[in-house]
């Protein structure tokens, strides 16, 4: 696989691009992410599904811009997929042929099941949870993927999307019809005869927007959307307030950004209906989806689209890019494990902290690559932002703080105040900092 790879996802509402750089066999990092609200499906559901000229031109110009960025980053491989709008459009070949002839880019139009599968591959590899159902709300469709023990059990796609619901129902003020349409489609989820988990992983712009609003409302300390988790019942009031809003000013007061005014009510309506009907108790927000799934199915094509056991892509990527002495890092990790076991009769910490101590020990010197004298502070920022994949928020905050106070005086209450919501008690943090010293 190429060292630098570009993946473009042409959705019904947004077009997104990620550029990813490999640092070793399975490790990689994101070097660019670009999004454009091209709304390629705009007007199509009122016109027999046919793509309209102006939206197609917007999408074409955005693709041209994306490819310029990709070329500037010296990407050697471009994977481009298109989802609901293009697979449904009778005239999709007009757009596909123009892009192929003018830009030299082959777009692969994927079916709904494949779209769902890509979301499942991304979340099962890049989130820490083992059992969940993905809910990926797009402009034209919504995908569901059942995951258990990090294995994909079933992938399905339904023609429920924000733009579709907006044009067919909301624009005609037919809210009752929208609800009936969604519930009728959701019967397919229950027909799979698979137990529906109480935990859902939310994918897509509408769901990420809702999560960001919840984070802001609750003054959540970590500015990271991927892996953010919330209790559904605790946040239903926000969903209801969005649906009650009559003007854009009211939406803005609730925390909705301007670029989401046009579909946030439809997205919230779809999401709330699904959560209620499937009796979902907890939502984990995913910052990854189809694009990362496309990349991972290529990267992991010889390993059943799964990382090896005990492999963490975030840890390996940080070590590849910033660790100055790989052997020393491995030595520190093994040493930390021994220290934890020897002192266990004194600290009585759960074994989950042993794994975090090992990770902290391996990564504690990555900050030296930027500045030796500020290495702990540098490492703190690297870890807080770099342990993005396959880590719960609590875990990455614990690792970052453990490293921050290594070879320093033990942390005090004031040192952990900002992130106390995500940290264990002070005594636990003092033990971890002591053992890494």
Which ranges hold each PLM region?
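Helical "lid/coupling" subdomains associated with nucleotide-phosphate turnover
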Residues: 5, 19, 43-68, 83-90, ...
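Short, electropositive alpha-helical surface patch
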Residues: 92-102
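N-terminal basic/disordered segments at the start of proteins
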Residues: 3-29
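A short acidic Gly-Thr/Ser loop motif
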Residues: 9-14, 135-141, 203-206, 287-289
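N-terminal glycine-rich anion-binding loops that anchor highly charged ligand groups
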Residues: 28-39
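Short acidic/polar active-site loop segments enriched in Thr and Asp
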Residues: 13, 76, 281
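Dinucleotide-binding Rossmann-like beta1-alpha1 core, especially the glycine-rich loop
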Residues: 80
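Residue-level detector of beta-propeller blades
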Residues: 30, 152-154
